[in-house]
Amino acid sequence: MFTVKVPATSANLGPGFDTLGLALQLYLELKVTIIPQSTRIRFFVDGEEYPEEIFGDNLVYQAMKKVFAEAAVVEAPGLELTINSSIPPGKGLGSSAAAIVAGLYAANEILEKRFTQEDLISWAVEMEGHADNVVPAVAGGLTTAMLYRGNVYYQQFTFPPELKLVVAVPDIQISTDESRQLLPKKIDFMDMVNNLQRASYLLASLIKHDFRYLPAAMDDVIFQPRRKQLIPGFDRVFSQALGNGAVGVALSGSGSSIIAFCQQEEKRVAEAMQDAFAASGIQSQLMILAADPDGVKVLR
């Protein structure tokens, strides 16, 4: 028996669309028990057993099947799979990436680590469609990733430990596909230049622990202005977070969660963000987290 533990992730961080990502201390755990002399798979989610006709669509299961197929395994061993996840789905916190990574790493563990981390990341990006959540889920910390000629390349950095992360999770569920439909087919040249400047400055500022201009560096001019129409109270939440002490704020992934970076006053910032959502008639949950430095772990 072993457990695969995968962190939630926050992608983009403002201007770093499909590029920047951050692992969070909020987890999906997949417990795997191998059943000798059996080929049956039993699947449990939060204590409830799923019938086969339902769990076949689960991303954990699909990811495991992907690895077994790549290894030319005709018949997988009997397994009992138990998922417990604290990552809310459809909230821009990398729930699908966590599920995919958990399944890939679980199957690879069963196969005695036959495949490399590069293999697993490549398949995860293939399944997810982009690297910004997958890479920090695997590597931990703050990451920047690129796809080039079919390959995934990334760098990982230590996120400043003095920054706490306030995540406001409104009672609004947004699919990534729905959110991406709002994105422009063409981008204004100067908007592209502005976002490129800000993403570069943001990454350098976090590496140097210089937070003076994070509000400017995280001010995305292309994607958040379009996606915010799905989130009532968006502008007020941003302004209240910054006005109460946050050093930076961004939409987390495709939303609906909003993440604020805080050196101090994180409880005050959290309450201000929740009050701002409430003023628009939206209930929200709050989490005060730290960055996860390690990424996926296999625990025995």
Curated annotation (Swiss-Prot):
Gene Ontology annotations for the cellular component aspect, listed alphabetically: cytoplasm
Main location as per UniProt: cytoplasm
EC category name: transferase
Protein's cellular compartments: Cytoplasm
Known pathway: Amino-acid biosynthesis; L-threonine biosynthesis; L-threonine from L-aspartate: step 4/5
Reactions catalysed according to its record: L-homoserine + ATP = O-phospho-L-homoserine + ADP + H(+)
Superkingdom per UniProt: Bacteria
Enzyme Commission number(s) from the entry: 2.7.1.39
GO MF, one example: homoserine kinase activity
InterPro entries reported in the protein's UniProt record: GHMP_kinase_C_dom, GHMP_kinase_C_sf, GHMP_kinase_N_dom, GHMP_knse_ATP-bd_CS, Homoserine_kinase, Ribosomal_Su5_D2-typ_SF, Ribsml_uS5_D2-typ_fold_subgr
Pfam family name, one: GHMP_kinases_C
GO biological process annotation, one example: threonine biosynthetic process
Residue numbers binding ATP: 88-98
Keywords (A to Z) from UniProt: Amino-acid biosynthesis, ATP-binding, Cytoplasm, Kinase, Nucleotide-binding, Threonine biosynthesis, Transferase
Family per similarity comment: Belongs to the GHMP kinase family. Homoserine kinase subfamily.
Alphabetical list of HAMAP family matching this protein: Homoser_kinase
Function: Catalyzes the ATP-dependent phosphorylation of L-homoserine to L-homoserine phosphate.
Protein name (database record): Homoserine kinase
Originating species: Syntrophomonas wolfei subsp. wolfei (strain DSM 2245B / Goettingen)
Organism placement in taxonomy: Bacteria, Bacillati, Bacillota, Clostridia, Eubacteriales
